[in-house]
From Swiss-Prot:
Belongs to the peptidase M16 family. Its cofactor is Zn(2+). Its EC number is 3.4.24.-. GO terms for biological process: proteolysis. SUPFAM superfamilies: LuxS/MPP-like metallohydrolase. Keywords: Hydrolase, Metal-binding, Metalloprotease, Protease, Zinc. The gene is pqqL. This is Probable zinc protease PqqL. Binds 1 zinc ion per subunit. The active site is at 82 (proton acceptor). One of its GO terms (molecular function) is metal ion binding. Zn(2+) binds at residues 79, 83, 159.
Length: 926
């Protein structure tokens, strides 16, 4: 029920320059690069050319109608209308809208989707090409959504079950605890009566006419906006808009009904406590409520910037405060968020180590009082102004992708907020950052603390106990602490510094240059290999990896859990002799992390930095290799979290433990850990395990990939990587052999009225490079055929997921099909699933479906190459598989590899009956 304030999110974001008037009451200037206007029928449009990524176009249709716009007998109908938009229109009956878009390479749920919240319904189309045909089809579909959705009784009846399964799937303790919080925070408002998922009794019985009534009342062009961002000709797009979306609607001659979005402010202290099965971590939330203010003026922009600085400094102090063990606090933070459309909530949120609420409340009140009385220091403000000034300079030249811009615009458009240009935002930040004073921060904090509407909300583990205080006592304690003189805040004068490292500089020589991928291979003087690739897909970012063979399946089974625990505790302690808090202090402006990674078959270290900080990251890497101390604090935290984990094991976890035991007998997995063993590990055991298995194996292959020049990489590699002693160990990888039980496994007792069905698929197979893509295509085919039967035909599920995979060293294909449903329909839907799999084996893959999925796979692959994270992963994976970049280009032969005969043969193997294992978790009463 919350969404972060759009203006807060937009500060320093990217979305080009005009003069700014200095009067604080002047309105913010709208980005001149965005073509925006209104068609004759009232439809607003926002069109922006952005060439990152090339050829892509992102379209968003925003309807200013959500669950808050429903009548009492329509609860859930805004969401049902959203579903019906994909079930038929005058031009595209039944599912033909999806079919038409998918023929152009778009994929349902990935490129074609929608969502409904309290205030809006949003439809999304992601086009992988900007050609005229796709744009015209997209506008044709949008016109159908705007004007011509049909509500045939049979179609509405078919979708009722789908919505019920969506409702069923989301049921959980976390949902219930969230609903309990919202009922308290939003008390007295329409919001608590209008959950977007709706009332299932209404969904089951409402007439098709009443569903259509909502559509005809609220889906009117003067209540909509369309957003188009991408590699486009804006004039052409606006012309297409006018040609395709200008249909008049007589209802626009009537006045739109006003909706009450108000959450009444309860201008006094409130105290409440909630609990829920499965919630085991106690917490305290202290909230202050106020009405929203005007956000489109220069004054409001400056105030939001002041608020951002205040929030940041509060959180920096909270980070220091939470480390004081007598506070009983595991984590603490402060943030501001929208509560509904017209209310702001400022929250101090604390997760506790124990249930000594009274003591922690007093400590929190004293913390707040000390800042209220003494304020922040000039050092704190100057440091933050310096950080934001540097960030402002960097953001001026950073490109933002079209997808992010389009999605950010949804919030701005829905809330009628001004969108600033890059240059205007830069100039405003530059001006206002030089003006902000300590008095501004103090005024802002005092205004929040003086708000009368306060709520202290405590979340207790079960069994819930009566609180040893009432609201009157809490108010008295607050007032007393605010008046009591507090201790001066200790700024912690000790300044941490990176240790000075001295070691011999090594050398490197270039062994290969792969022109096709612009990939360099170097041999370091210690024998290790370095792979370098320049990419600015994420500007100002570099990925570093040091990887070697090994992993959890190369060590004795008895040490599996010991090593996992050792990695966790060592990383939580810090980096070598530097504590985690010291690392955070040194790199507070530009955070750096070097983390241990360990998989089944490989291990090493990973980190991400800005180009200018790569030397610091490599320094941390060298420190990490030097020693692996374990602090008392990190060990105690590990033990506390272990106890909490075993305390809160729910039926879902027990189910996964049982399934894992059946499929991996006599093999240690993440589900076989035992509390006594996990808590028995001491410092020496953990340190020795990390030293032996991690630090004594340093025959790495290094990867440096990102926005950094070759010469800089070579210098850093010679200094920091080439002189590392290459330690080797002889280890033998032991692949896990998956067992397929002959009988289905059923566990009863789920507290939700739901069944979770998982069908595992296993087959012996020799790994081949190209199978990654073939697995994806087969999984998509299986998933679509199941969706058409289980969802579209029999309305038994909301969604189904399927996947197949095989690791390089694994002797088997592993796959999974999963869905949730009404417990009464488990047998029926499982039978239908097996029917679909049997039919694929018997009759093979439909060639039209294969062509469609092949086109979708090509689209997905192109998108992967737009992401630096994906590029780094693809390069590393290729070298891991065959010690060269050849596997990167397998996709170029996909049309020849993914033939009907090949996919049919793969399906025959992967879907065979003898490799299927059905596991079901369902409600106790079924």
């Amino acid at each position: 029920m919350k969404k972060t304030t759009a203006l807060f999110l937009l500060i320093f974001s990217l979305i080009a320059c005009q003069s700014l008037e200095l009067s604080p009451n002047n309105n913010l200037p709208f980005d001149p690069n965005i073509q925006h206007g209104k068609l004759s029928n009232g439809l607003q449009y926002f069109v922006l050319k952005n060439t990152e990524p090339k050829e892509r176009v992102y379209i968003r249709l925003v309807i200013n109608a959500g669950s808050m716009h429903e009548d009492d007998d329509q609860k859930g109908i805004a969401h049902l209308v959203e579903h019906m938009a994909f079930n038929g229109s005058k031009k595209y009956p039944e599912n033909q809208i999806i079919n038409a878009l998918e023929k152009l390479g778009m994929k349902f749920a990935r490129d074609i989707n929608a969502f409904t919240d309290f205030e809006n319904t949003v439809y999304t189309l992601n086009l992988d090409s900007n050609n005229q045909q796709k744009l015209e089809l997209a506008f044709d579909v949008i016109n159908e959504w705007m004007n011509n959705i049909t509500f045939l009784p049979k179609d509405v009846d078919g979708e009722r079950g789908v919505v019920q399964e969506e409702w069923r799937r989301r049921l959980s303790p976390m949902l219930r605890i969230g609903n309990k919080k919202s009922a308290i925070e939003m008390a007295g408002s329409r919001y608590v009566l209008r959950d977007p998922i709706g009332d299932m009794d209404i969904i089951k019985t409402i007439s098709a006419k009443r569903v259509a009534d909502f559509y005809h009342k609220w889906y009117r062009p003067d209540n909509m906006s369309v957003i188009i961002v991408g590699d486009i000709d804006t004039k052409q797009v606006v012309k297409l808009l006018k040609q395709n979306l200008s249909q008049e609607n007589p209802i626009t001659k009537t006045t739109l009904e006003k909706i009450d979005f108000n959450i009444p402010l309860i201008n006094k202290w409130r105290l409440d406590s909630i609990s829920e099965q499965g919630t085991t971590i106690p917490s305290i939330e202290l909230s202050f409520f106020e009405n929203t203010i005007e956000t489109n003026t220069l004054a409001s922009y400056k105030q939001e910037l002041i608020q951002q600085i205040t929030t940041r400094l509060l959180n920096l102090r909270l980070q220091q405060w939470e480390k004081e063990t007598e506070n009983g606090v595991d984590s603490a933070n402060f943030y501001r968020t929208h509560l509904g459309k017209e209310t702001l909530q400022s929250i101090f949120s604390l997760q506790l180590i124990d249930t000594q609420y009274s003591k922690t409340i007093d400590k929190l009140f004293a913390f707040i009082a000390s800042i209220k009385q003494q304020g922040f220091t000039q050092n704190e403000l100057s440091g933050e102004i310096k950080r934001l000034t540097q960030l402002n300079e960097k953001q001026l030249n950073i490109r933002s992708g079209s997808l992010k811009i389009a999605d950010d615009l949804i919030t701005s458009v829905a809330n009628k907020q001004v969108v600033l240009s890059v240059n205007d935002r830069y100039e405003l930040n530059k001006r206002f950052l030089s003006q902000i004073t300590l008095a501004d921060l103090q005024r802002t904090l005092n205004q929040t603390l003086a708000l009368k509407a306060k709520l202290l909300l405590i979340t207790q583990p079960l069994p819930q106990k009566a609180l040893p205080f009432d609201v009157a006592e809490i108010e008295t304690r607050w007032n007393n602490v605010m008046e009591m003189q507090q201790h001066q805040w200790d700024e912690k004068k000790q300044i941490e510094k990176l240790p000075h490292l001295t070691f011999n500089t090594g050398s490197l020589s270039q062994e290969k240059y792969w022109d096709r991928g612009d990939i360099y291979e170097f041999r370091l003087s210690n024998g290790s290999k370095l792979i370098y690739h320049y990419s600015d897909k994420t500007p100002n970012q570099v990925h570093f990896r040091a990887v070697t063979q090994g992993g959890l399946r190369s060590i004795p089974n008895k040490d599996y859990h010991l090593l996992r625990a050792a990695v966790s505790v060592v990383d939580e302690t810090g980096v070598g002799e530097l504590s985690l808090s010291a690392v955070n202090q040194i790199f507070s402006r530009d955070p750096l992390v070097i983390a241990t990674v360990i998989d089944d078959d490989k291990q090493g270290f990973t980190g991400v930095s800005k180009p200018k900080d790569l030397e610091n990251l490599l320094t941390l890497f060298r420190l990490k290799l030097r020693s692996s101390p374990i602090s008392d604090l990190a060990l105690e935290k590990y033990r506390r979290e272990t106890r909490d984990y075993f305390k809160q094991i729910d039926l879902e976890t027990q189910f996964m433990q049982a399934v894992s035991k059946l499929r991996f007998p006599n093999i240690e997995t993440v589900y076989t850990q035992k509390q006594a063993q996990q808590l028995s590990f001491d410092k020496n055991q953990l340190n020795n395990a990390y030293q032996h298995y991690i630090l004594d194996k340093t025959d790495f292959t290094y990867f440096i990939i990102g926005d950094i020049e070759l010469n800089q990489v070579k210098k850093l590699a010679e200094r920091y990587l080439a002189s590392i002693e290459s330690k080797t160990q002889i280890r033998h990888f032991v692949p896990t052999i998956i067992h397929t039980p002959t009988q289905s496994f059923i566990m009863n007792g789920l507290k939700e009225p739901r069944a979770d069905v998982e069908i595992y698929l296993t087959a012996d197979n020799t790994w081949r490079t190209e199978q990654k893509y073939l697995f994806n295509i087969l999984a998509d085919i299986v998933q679509e055929k199941l969706r058409l039967i289980l969802r579209e035909k029999v309305s038994g599920i909301y969604s189904v997921n399927s996947w197949f995979m095989q690791d390089v060293y694994a002797p088997q294909i592993e796959g999974k099909i999963e869905f949730s449903c009404d417990p009464k329909r488990v047998e029926e839907l499982t039978y239908l699933t097996n029917q679909v799999l049997d039919d694929i084996i018997k009759n093979g893959i439909d060639e039209n479906l294969l062509r469609k999925k092949l086109a979708e796979q090509h689209t997905q692959i192109r998108r992967e190459f737009d992401s630096l994270v994906s590029i780094a992963s693809i390069i590393e994976e290729s070298y891991w598989q065959q010690d060269n970049p050849d596997a990167i280009y397998t996709y170029q032969h996909l049309d020849q590899l993914a033939t009907k005969a090949t996919i049919d043969a793969l399906a025959q193997k992967a879907l065979k009956k003898s490799g299927r294992f059905v596991s079901i978790l369902k409600a106790a009463s079924y």
